[in-house]
């Protein structure tokens, strides 16, 4: 069932990203979306739209529908940093969301 949930989530994520955005599984239950040339405000709005879509529609993965929540960490790569540093900041923001009760978007 776990793989079916990941596939269902990935489908919601992909449906809300733009052509040219990159979606990857990052760790066990995390995803990473790279959104080139996307202003921070638009990236936050996309994360919020995905969060709401997951929260409002229980996923049907073959058994009883499963209610899920998603937490997000959003950041923008600064001109003075590499991608790894930006990802680390997004990860910190993700854990801010999780520690603040989950099911929210935090910005780094």
Residue ranges of model-derived segments:
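Active-site-proximal alpha-helical element of nucleotidyl cyclase-like catalytic domains
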Residues: 1-22, 30, 36, 54
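A short glycine-centered flexible hinge/capping loop motif at secondary-structure junctions
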Residues: 2, 27-28, 62-63, 101-102
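Alpha-helical scaffold within the catalytic cores of cyclic-nucleotide enzymes
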Residues: 10-11, 42-58, 89
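Short catalytic/binding micro-motifs of nucleotide second-messenger systems
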Residues: 15-20, 52-64, 94-96
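A short pre-motif secondary-structure segment
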Residues: 22-25, 66
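Residue-level recognition of strand-loop junctions within catalytic nucleotide-signaling folds
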Residues: 35-39, 55, 77-78
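Catalytic-core segments of nucleotide cyclases and related cyclic-nucleotide turnover enzymes
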Residues: 44, 62, 76-106
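PAS and PAS-like sensory/regulatory domains
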Residues: 68-70
């Amino acid at each position: 069932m776990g793989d079916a949930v990941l596939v269902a989530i990935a489908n919601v994520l992909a449906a809300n990203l733009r052509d040219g955005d990159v979606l990857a599984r990052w760790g066990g239950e995390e995803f990473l979306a790279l959104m080139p040339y996307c202003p921070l405000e638009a990236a936050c709005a996309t994360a919020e739209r995905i969060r709401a879509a997951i929260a409002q529609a229980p996923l049907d993965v073959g058994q009883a529908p499963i209610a899920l929540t998603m937490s997000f960490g959003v950041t923008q790569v600064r001109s003075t940093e590499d991608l790894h540093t930006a990802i680390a900041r997004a990860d910190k923001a993700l854990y801010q969301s999780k520690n603040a009760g989950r099911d929210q978007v935090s910005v780094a």
